[in-house]
UniProtKB/Swiss-Prot annotation:
Its cofactor is Mg(2+). The record marks K20 as: Important for catalytic activity. Homodimer. One of its GO terms (biological process) is selenocysteine biosynthetic process. This is Selenide, water dikinase. ATP binds at K20, T48, R49, D50, D68, D91, G139, H140, S141. Synthesizes selenophosphate from selenide and ATP. InterPro entries: PurM-like_C_dom, PurM-like_C_sf, PurM-like_N, PurM-like_N_sf, SelD_I, SPS/SelD.
Length: 347
């Protein structure tokens, strides 16, 4: 079987970050008294559901450690590797850091798919690592019933510049660096609904590095940062709000969206992860049409950075973004928490 004839997505029950365990189930898994052990040098653990762990070396520098892997979201092996690696490396950028090394995680059904196809996946991962300026230094592989690929990535960051998802403040404006709709477009493609002019758009967005995060970290007015992945914009924004004790007002029309995404939602191209996200976070939302809900809960794979920015830093953030070819528009704001109001209001 050649790399050109296979459809990797046929060999997995999930796709990309959409195969994440739901937040509700994850809460049960992670609930443990032992998890309360605290190392004073561990600046960021799993208590705020940040993008990565951060360990203070005590010399002004901290180490960032993260891992991310998933099943195929596209059929092309090389692109699958690129997307999975780009998604994993993004966690380092979301913390404001610089990646320095990665190792691969590979699960492969060796009796179903040839090692040559696995090599193409790995080469895609290596290509993404080179784009980030790091080596794919090793890894671990197992014989698995479904193809899985990802990375464990190590990075560094000046301790004073670590960006968490829990340090946002009321008054911050919200910015998103990539358009929403990755889950919708990839689902539309699987259902043979995707128009020719939209072919490859989701892959292009997923392969785009969030390298700007390291530069955003240098801006004092960037108070919080996270990447939007499997829990959708609603999930990751809710976690930012919960961690900081604030609420959000979002302008739906200002949210960047992939072309055709609203049409595909109406045609039923909604991934299964969308409903799981709504089941976990829907109670935090105000009233809104079903189509709006489905986009805000759409699981993103290798999605954009969500930034909480003080108004006085807006111009500097936009200028920095432009240096990376990113055009930013505020999609909302954070406000003081008030009882009786939805955590995330859509206008």
């Amino acid at each position: 079987m050649s790399e050109n004839s296979i459809r990797l997505t046929q060999y997995s029950h999930g796709a990309g970050c959409g195969c994440k365990i739901s937040p509700k189930v994850l809460e049960t898994i992670l609930h443990s008294e032992q998890a309360k052990f605290v190392d004073p040098n561990l600046l960021v653990g799993n208590e705020t559901r940040d993008d990565a762990a951060v360990y203070d070396l005590g010399n002004g520098t901290s180490v960032i450690s993260t891992t991310d892997f998933f099943m195929p979201i596209v059929d092309n092996p090389f692109d699958f590797g690129r997307i999975a690696a780009t998604n994993a490396i993004s966690d380092i950028f979301a913390m404001g850091g610089k990646p320095i090394m990665a190792i691969a995680i590979l699960g492969w059904p060796i009796n179903k798919l040839s090692p040559e196809i696995a090599r193409e996946v790995t080469e895609g991962g290596r290509y993404a690592c080179r784009q980030a300026g790091i080596a794919l230094a090793g890894g671990h592989s197992i014989d698995a019933p479904e193809p899985i690929f990802g990375l464990a990535v190590t990075g560094i960051v000046p301790t004073e510049r670590v960006k968490k998802n829990s340090t946002a403040q009321a008054g911050c404006k919200l910015f998103l660096t990539k358009p929403l709709g990755i889950g919708v477009l990839t689902t539309a493609e699987k259902k043979s609904l995707l128009k020719p002019e939209h072919q490859g758009l989701a892959t292009e967005v997923m392969c785009r590095m969030n390298i700007a995060g390291a530069s955003f970290a240098n801006i004092e007015g960037v108070k919080a940062m996270t990447d939007v992945t499997g829990f959708g914009l609603l999930g990751h924004l809710s976690e930012m709000c919960q961690g900081a004790g604030v609420q959000a007002r979002v302008d739906y029309e200002a949210i960047p969206k992939l072309p055709g995404v609203e049409e595909y939602i109406k045609l039923g191209a909604v991934p299964g992860g969308t409903e799981r996200n709504f089941a976990s976070y829907g109670h935090l939302m105000g009233e809104m049409p079903r189509e709006v809900r489905d986009l805000l809960c759409d699981p993103q794979t290798s999605g954009g950075l969500l930034l909480a920015v003080m108004p006085e830093a807006e111009n500097e953030v936009k200028t920095t973004a432009a240096e990376f070819g990113i055009e930013l528009t505020a999609i909302g704001e954070l406000v003081p928490a008030r009882g009786g109001r939805a955590m995330v209001e859509i206008r």
